[in-house]
Structures are given as C-alpha cells and as structure tokens.
Amino acid sequence: MVLKNLSLLIILFFSTSVFSVSNNLINIPITVVATATGADSKTLSDLKNINGLNLQIPAKCFTKGKLPFLASSDEVRFNCLRDALFDKSDNVVWSLRGGYGSARIIPDLLKLSKPNKEKFFIGYSDITALHLFLSQEWGWRTIHGSNIADLLKTEKDQGNFTKLGEILKGKVKQVTIDNLIPLNDIAKSSDLVKGNLTGGNLTMVQTSIGTRWQIKTKGKILFLEDTNVAPFRLDRELLHLKQSMLLEGVKAIIFGSFGKDLDATMLVLRNFAYSLNIPVFKTNRFGHERINDPIIYNTNSKIIMSKHKEFKLIMEL
C-alpha cells in the first residue's frame, strides 16, 4: 500500500510539474516539426498529453525512412517543414529535437520563395542549419532556444520555456542574457558592443562553410555553443572558422556551454580569445546544458558593461 501511494504521489508530482511548465504556453498554437532526428512513439504521446499545450504533431511527418537516425525521409521532412512555414495559420513552428539531418533539406529550401508571413521558429543544436537559412535568406528573426521535446526532460530548467512563452506572447520588449564573463583584455574594456546576432551550434556553423547557406558573420555578434566536444576538436573547429576568414569583421563572440566546460575546454577558449582582436565572452546561459536562454537572430542587440563591470547581452524585440 505504501509503495502504491508513493507511486501515485510521483505520478501526481510529475503531472503537476509539467502542467505548471506548460501553463506559460497555454493558447499558443504550435506545429511540431522534425527536420533532424525523430522520437519514439512514447515521446510523441507524452508531448500530446501535456495538459494545456496546443500541439499539432502530424503523424505523416514521423514515418521512418531508410536512415534510422532521421525522423523520416528527406522528402517527408522537407515537405512537413515547408507546410508548417507556408500555411495560413499563426502557429509557432517548433523543432522536436536536434540530432542530425537539417542540413540535408536546405537545398530544397533554397528553391522556395520567401512566404508572405513570418512565423516564430524555435530550436537549437542541429537546427542551427535552419536558423542560418531562415535568418539569412528570408531575413526572419528566429529563436535559438529549447526544442519542444526538452519539456519532458527533468534535467532541463523549465524556466527556458517560461522565457520563450514571454517572447511568444509579446510580454517582453527586451531579452537579456546576464553573466557574460570576458575572456580577453579587449572584452574587459568593452563598455558597449552593438550588432545583430548570428551563430548557434559550432559543429553546424562549421558544416555551413563552403555551402550556399554558409554563415554570414560580418558586422555581427557571433554566439557559439556545442556539447561533448573534445578540447582538441574544439580548437580545430575554431581554427577552421578563423582561417576561413569568417571572423573578419565580427563585432564580438559569445561562447555558451560546451558540455561540462572542463579545464581543458576553458583553456582552449581563453587561448583562442587572446588570439583575436575582438571582445570574446563566456556564459553558461545557453547551450545543451540545464539552462538554455533564448537568443534571437537578426535583432538589434548590444553587449553592455554595468558600472560594476558586469556584462550582459540585450536583445531588442
């Protein structure tokens, strides 16, 4: 009887915590897209059963293709994304999860004309490929933020979704990321840096190099994050960015989390920062770890230093 009651309490607690999280997203119509790796039927069912969420998860978009690490075939994933971006609804287009596969459908996206209506588009990790396309080709202000499946992950800070909900409902005029730590002397003395934002997952940014959707960095504040990256690999990827001349004209760089940010990882980031003549900052407020604050592409943004010499990123909506 004790075990049975304990089980009921656990179920009740889980249900209540999910409901309180989703409460901030109530009445927001959302179309879920899976442009990369998919999810099992239980994950999809659990998402559909979150009280208060208005999710549209088209079953036709989750038919396995030849490659098991993709949600469905390239054709199906492209068609489902296209339909979500172009339909007449006001639905938010929200990525299910990252993984791998978004870059595979960009050649088809490049054939499309820009739709008449801009929609909110949210996701991160592998979804960086789509952010670069949508922000550069269509001029959209997309949101680098938690994928919708993160709602089911207890290790994620559900405040990530509170902040996203505030943006979607128009409750805020500014979005900020605090606790930027300067990594080089130029950053320490920078009281104001202005520029629109671009970037995302470092691996995907590197993947873009040499493609038709290559990242455009000139005059921008570049933000970068990644996960489970060995220090030597991190150094190699950053070196590639630098030697590709993609850091020429960049206003500043903000590094998010890179896994557990081991001492060796921080050594690589600091060493890289001191090799550049631009301000470089570090924060744990976005990326694959517990906290993933939203960052908005193509917004008027600035990094400011307070009178206490603390730094923050401010994005105007």
Curated annotation (Swiss-Prot):
Record SUPFAM superfamilies: Class I glutamine amidotransferase-like, LD-carboxypeptidase A C-terminal domain-like
A single GO molecular function term of this UniProt record: carboxypeptidase activity
Keywords recorded for this protein, A-Z: Carboxypeptidase, Hydrolase, Protease, Serine protease
Top class in the EC scheme: hydrolase
GO biological process: proteolysis
Record flagged with keyword Chaperone: no
PANTHER family for this protein: MURAMOYLTETRAPEPTIDE CARBOXYPEPTIDASE, MUREIN TETRAPEPTIDE CARBOXYPEPTIDASE
Protein name, entry field: Putative carboxypeptidase RP402
Organism: Rickettsia prowazekii (strain Madrid E)
